[in-house]
From Swiss-Prot:
Residues 91-284 form the DH domain. SUPFAM superfamilies: C2 domain (Calcium/lipid-binding domain, CaLB), DBL homology domain (DH-domain), GTPase activation domain, GAP, PH domain-like. Protein with a unique structure having two opposing regulatory activities toward small GTP-binding proteins. The C-terminus is a GTPase-activating protein domain which stimulates GTP hydrolysis by RAC1, RAC2 and CDC42. Accelerates the intrinsic rate of GTP hydrolysis of RAC1 or CDC42, leading to down-regulation of the active GTP-bound form. The central Dbl homology (DH) domain functions as guanine nucleotide exchange factor (GEF) that modulates the GTPases CDC42, RHOA and RAC1. Promotes the conversion of CDC42, RHOA and RAC1 from the GDP-bound to the GTP-bound form. Interacts with DLG4. One of its GO terms (biological process) is inner ear morphogenesis. Residues 54-64 have a biased composition (Polar residues). This is Active breakpoint cluster region-related protein.
Length: 859
C-alpha cells in the first residue's frame, strides 16, 4: 500500500480529496531521464487491511472501470448461515484488529491537531495574538467533536477485540458512528476555507508557520517511534480520508459476517447510512472540477493516465500521459525546490478529434525502433537484484538508515534506466494537422488499453479546437490533482510490507477458449511483470478456423519478482499487405485480454490450479503451478539408467560410445539447420508438451527420433536441449568445481584469470569438457546471426549460464536463504563465466590437455 505523503500537499477542495483517496506526495522525477529517489514521508500511517488505490474509493472505482455509476448501495452478501462461519468470524477479527490499529493512529493525529488549539486560544485575547478567535474556529472547526466521537468509539471497540469470542457484538458501535456523520458534513463544507485560512496565517505569521509545519503525532503503543512530525495541512486532510475508509471497512465486515449474526443488520444499516452520506456529498457539486471544461462548455474528465516512454529527437524520455474526454496531453513533472508545489510542464497535446492511428503501411515508413542492447539490460537487472540483497542485509543487520537510503537511491537509478530502455513495442499516434509521436511500451496489453480508451472516446461527437495559453495552463495545472498514477512503476517505490513477488518458474497450461462469435485463426500470448513492467513470455500455436480452440499447451515461465499474469487472445493476420516488417509491430487483432494476480498461497501449492479468465465475453481456461527458485536448484537423478535425462553424462557417452551425447548432437544439428535465424532462439519458450514428447522419445531411444525432430517446432527442440542440461544429476561444469569457477571469474589480473579459467576446464571430466566445447562453438555460431536472431553472446550466456553452472544444494543451503539472494549472488557470476568462454578465441581440447599455460593474447 502506498503511504500518504504529508509534504507538498496541493491546495484541494474537499471534493478533490473525496475523489482522490490516495497519496498526493508523488515521488519527484525528471522526465528527461534523471530520477531522484526520495525516502518515505514522515507521519505516514500503515493500515494492514485496506487498499488505498483509487479503485477503492466509491467514485473512483466506477471511473476507473469506465462507467459513470458509483458502487451500488446494496451491501455485499454476507456468509450464509453456518457456511464457513468460523472462518468468517476469524477474518472479521482480523479486519477489526486492523481497523482498530488505524483508528488509534487517527485519534493520535486528531490529538496532535488539537494540541496547539488551546495555547492559540489563550493568546488570542492578549495584546499579541498569534491568531484571532475567528481564525482559530475556522481552522479547527469540528475537530474537537470528531475527536470525541472517535475516542468514544475506540474505547468501546478496543476491549471487544482484545477479549474476542464468536459471540461478541459490535454492530451497534458502527451504527452509532455512522449516525454521527453529520459532523463530518460540517467539517467537509468548511475544509476549503480552513485550508485557505491556515495558509494565509502561515504566510503572515512566522510563529504560526513554525507551529503548523511540525506538529508532533504520537506513535502507536507498540511502535518504536515515539513521535513523528506532520504538517497541519496534512492532518486537516485526515478526516476527509477517514470518511471513505470507514465505508470500506463496513464492506469488509459484512463480507465476513454470517447473515444470521446479530451484527449483520446493524452493519447493513451503518453501511446504508455511510453510502447515503457519500452520495449526498457527491450530488452537491459537479462530479468533476468545473475549472477544466471542454470547448463546448462540458466537464472535461480524466479517463486514464500513466507513465510512458516517448521517443523524442532519437532519445527516450519518460512522460506522464493524460487522456481526457477530448484531448491527449503529454507532460513531464517539473523539478521544484523543497516546499514548493509540484507542477507539470506540457510537452504537447492532441485534441482527440485530430488524433489518428497510422496504418501498418504508414508505420512501416516511420523510423525503425532500435532496441537497447540486451546484455546491458541484463546487467541492470543483475545490479538491481544485487542491490535488493544488500538492502535486505543492511535491514537484517540493523544498518544505518543513510546507508540503506544510498542503496535505495542506487537501486532506483538502475530501475529507472531499465524502465526507460527496455520497452520496444511501438505505439504511434498522429495529429492529422501535423506531427506524429512515438511511444515505446513493453506490453501489447498496455498498448491495447490505451488504443481502446482513445477509440471509445472518439465515438462521441468531438470537435477540433486549439487551447489558448491560459486554457493550456489550467488544464496542465489540473493534472497534478487529477492523476491516478503517482509513482513511476519501479519496485523501489514499494513499501517494505508489500509482497516482493514470486521468484522461480511458473508452469502454465493454456487449455482452451470459448465465446467467439465466428471462426478465426486464434492464439494466445502470456505476459508477466518483472522489475516493475510487463513483458511477453510465451505464445501458443495458431488454432485455425475455429470458434473453440483447444491448445492444451504448457509453458515454463521464469518469474523475477512477478505478481501478475496476463493472457491476450489474438486473431492471426495472414494478409501480407497488413503485416509490418518491424518485428515489434504486432498487427494481429486482439480479441480479448485479461489479468490475474499471482497469489503466493494459491500458486505455491504442489498441485495444478485450474482457473478461467473472462475477457470481452471470451473465456480462456488455463492451469498453473509454481516452482520456487530454491526448489528449481534441486536436480533429480533418473531412476532408469537406460534413459538420457537425469543420467550422468559419462554413463550416456559410454553407453552410446560417443564423445558427445546423441541428444546434444541432434538438437544442435537441427537448430543450426533451420533455427539459427529464428528470432529469440533459446530465449523463447517452447511448448512444454512438445518438449516432454521429445524427452520421452530420446529417453526411449525411439527409432523415429529424426523424423519427429524434423517436424517439431524449433523452439521445442531448443527447449529440449536446455532441459537436458538442466536435468543432469549435476551441472555440466560440476558441483566440485563450482566454487573455483566463482573465484576464477572474480580475478582482476587478465593473465591470472585466463590461467585459472583454462586450468578449470582441464579439470573437467573428458565427457563434460568435450560436450561443453561442442556447445560453446555452437553458441558462437548462433551469435554470429545476432542481427537476424537478436541473440548476442551475452543473451546466450544469460540463458545457458545458470543451467551449466549452479551451486550444489548443500552449498546453496549453507550460504543463501532466499530466492532473491540466490539470483543476485550467483546468476551474475554464472553468466560471466560462460560469457568469458564464449568471448574467448577457439579453445582446443588437445591444447588444453597438454597441461600448459594457455594465453589467448599477450597479457
Amino acid at each position: 500500500m502506498e503511504p500518504l505523503s504529508h509534504r507538498g500537499l496541493p491546495r484541494l477542495s474537499w471534493i478533490d480529496t473525496l475523489y482522490s483517496n490516495f497519496s498526493y506526495g508523488a515521488e519527484d522525477y525528471d522526465a528527461e531521464g534523471h530520477e531522484e529517489q526520495k525516502g518515505p514521508p514522515e507521519g505516514s500511517e500503515t493500515m494492514p487491511y485496506i487498499d488505498e488505490s483509487p479503485t477503492m474509493s466509491p467514485q473512483l472505482s466506477a471511473r476507473s472501470q469506465g462507467g459513470g455509476e458509483s458502487i451500488s448501495p446494496t451491501p455485499p452478501e454476507g456468509l450464509a448461515p453456518g457456511v464457513e462461519a468460523g472462518k468468517g468470524l476469524e477474518m472479521r477479527k482480523l479486519v477489526l484488529s486492523g481497523f482498530l490499529a488505524s483508528e488509534e493512529i487517527y485519534i493520535n493525529q486528531l490529538e496532535a491537531l488539537l494540541l496547539p488549539m488551546k495555547p492559540l486560544k489563550a493568546t488570542a485575547t492578549t495584546s499579541q495574538p498569534v491568531l484571532t478567535i475567528q481564525q482559530i474556529e475556522t481552522i479547527f472547526y469540528k475537530i474537537q467533536d470528531i475527536y470525541e466521537i472517535h475516542k468514544e468509539f475506540y474505547d468501546n471497540l478496543c476491549p471487544k477485540v482484545q477479549q474476542w469470542d464468536s459471540q461478541v457484538t459490535m454492530g451497534h458501535l458502527f451504527q452509532k458512528l455512522a449516525s454521527q456523520l453529520g459532523v463530518y458534513k460540517a467539517f467537509v463544507d468548511n475544509y476549503k476555507v480552513a485550508l485557505e485560512t491556515a495558509e494565509k496565517c502561515s504566510q503572515s505569521n512566522n510563529q504560526f508557520q513554525k507551529i503548523s509545519e511540525e506538529l508532533k503525532v504520537k506513535g502507536p503503543k507498540d511502535s518504536k517511534d515515539s513521535h513523528t512530525s506532520v504538517t497541519m495541512e496534512a492532518l486537516l486532510y485526515k478526516p476527509i480520508d477517514r470518511v471513505t475508509r470507514s465505508t470500506l471497512v463496513l464492506h469488509d465486515l459484512l463480507k465476513h459476517t454470517p447473515v444470521d449474526h446479530p451484527d449483520y443488520p446493524l452493519l447493513q444499516d451503518a453501511l446504508r447510512i455511510s453510502q447515503n452520506f457519500l452520495s449526498s456529498i457527491n450530488e452537491d457539486i459537479d462530479p468533476r472540477r468545473t475549472a477544466v471544461t471542454t470547448p463546448k462548455g462540458e466537464t472535461r474528465q480524466l479517463v486514464k493516465d500513466g507513465f510512458l516512454v516517448e521517443m523524442s529527437e532519437s532519445s527516450r524520455k519518460l512522460r506522464h500521459v493524460f487522456l481526457f474526454t477530448d484531448v491527449l496531453l503529454c507532460a513531464k513533472l517539473k523539478k521544484t525546490s523543497a516546499g514548493k508545489h509540484q507542477q507539470y510542464d506540457c510537452k504537447w497535446y492532441i485534441p482527440l478529434a485530430d488524433l489518428v492511428f497510422p496504418s501498418p503501411e504508414e508505420s512501416e515508413a516511420s523510423p525503425q525502433v532500435h532496441p537497447f542492447p540486451d546484455h546491458e539490460l541484463e546487467d541492470m537487472k543483475v545490479k538491481i537484484s544485487a542491490l535488493k540483497s544488500e538492502i535486505q542485509k543492511e535491514k537484517a543487520n540493523k544498518g544505518q538508515s543513510r546507508a540503506i537510503e544510498r542503496l535505495k537511491k542506487k537501486m532506483f537509478e538502475n530501475e529507472f534506466l531499465l524502465l526507460l530502455n527496455s520497452p520496444t513495442i511501438p505505439f504511434r499516434i498522429h495529429n492529422r494537422n501535423g506531427k506524429s509521436y512515438l511511444f515505446l511500451l513493453s506490453s501489447d496489453y498496455e498498448r491495447s488499453e490505451w488504443r481502446e480508451a482513445i477509440q471509445k472516446l472518439q465515438k462521441k461527437d468531438l470537435q477540433a479546437f486549439v487551447l489558448s495559453s491560459v486554457e493550456l495552463q489550467v488544464l496542465t495545472g489540473s493534472c497534478f490533482k487529477l492523476r491516478t498514477v503517482h509513482n513511476i512503476p519501479v519496485t523501489s517505490n514499494k513499501d517494505d510490507d508489500e509482497s516482493p513477488g514470486l521468484y522461480g518458474f511458473l508452469h502454465v497450461i493454456v487449455h482452451s477458449a470459448k465465446g467467439f462469435k465466428q471462426s478465426a485463426n486464434l492464439y494466445c500470448t502470456l505476459e508477466v511483470d518483472s522489475f516493475g513492467y510487463f513483458v511477453s513470455k510465451a505464445k501458443t500455436r495458431v488454432f485455425r478456423d475455429t470458434t473453440e480452440p483447444k491448445w492444451d499447451e504448457e509453458f515454463e515461465i521464469e518469474l523475477e519478482g512477478s505478481q501478475s499474469l496476463r493472457i491476450l487472445c489474438y486473431e492471426k493476420c495472414y494478409d501480407k499487405t497488413k503485416v509490418n516488417k518491424d518485428n515489434n509491430e504486432i498487427v494481429d487483432k486482439i480479441m480479448g485480454k485479461g489479468q490475474i494476480q499471482l497469489d503466493p498461497q494459491t500458486v505455491e501449492s504442489k498441485n495444478w490450479h485450474t482457473d478461467v479468465i473472462e475477457m470481452n465475453g471470451i473465456k480462456v481456461e488455463f492451469s498453473m503451478k509454481f516452482t520456487s527458485r530454491d526448489m528449481s536448484l534441486k536436480r533429480t537423478p533418473s531412476k532408469k539408467q537406460t534413459g538420457v535425462f537425469g543420467v550422468k553424462i559419462s554413463v550416456v557417452t559410454k553407453r552410446e560410445r560417443s564423445k558427445v551425447p546423441y541428444i546434444v548432437r541432434q538438437c544442435i544439428e537441427e537448430v543450426e539447420k533451420r533455427g539459427i535465424e529464428e528470432v529469440g532462439i533459446y530465449r523463447i519458450s517452447g511448448v512444454a508438451t512438445d518438449i516432454q514428447a521429445l524427452k520421452a522419445v530420446f529417453d526411449a531411444n525411439n527409432k523415429d527420433i529424426l523424423l519427429m525432430l524434423s517436424d517439431m517446432d524449433i523452439n521445442a527442440i531448443a527447449g529440449t536441449l536446455k532441459l537436458y542440461f538442466r536435468e543432469l544429476p549435476e551441472p555440466l561444469l560440476t558441483d566440485r568445481l563450482y566454487p573455483a569457477f566463482m573465484e576464477g571469474i572474480a580475478l582482476s589480473d587478465p593473465a591470472a584469470k585466463e590461467n585459472c579459467m583454462m586450468h578449470l576446464l582441464r579439470s573437467l571430466p573428458d565427457p563434460n569438457l568435450i560436450t561443453f566445447l561442442f556447445l560453446l562453438e555452437h553458441l558462437k555460431r548462433v551469435a554470429e546471426k545476432e542481427p537476424i536472431n537478436k541473440m548476442s553472446l551475452h543473451n546466450l550466456a544469460t540463458v545457458f549460464g545458470p543451467t551449466l553452472l549452479r551451486p550444489s544444494e548443500v552449498e546453496s543451503k549453507a550460504h543463501l536463504t532466499s530466492a532473491a539472494d540466490i539470483w543476485s549472488h550467483d546468476v551474475m557470476a554464472q553468466v560471466q563465466v560462460l560469457l568469458y568462454y564464449l568471448q574467448h578465441p577457439p579453445i582446443s581440447f588437445a591444447e588444453l590437455k597438454r597441461n600448459t599455460l594457455y594465453f589467448s593474447t599477450d597479457v
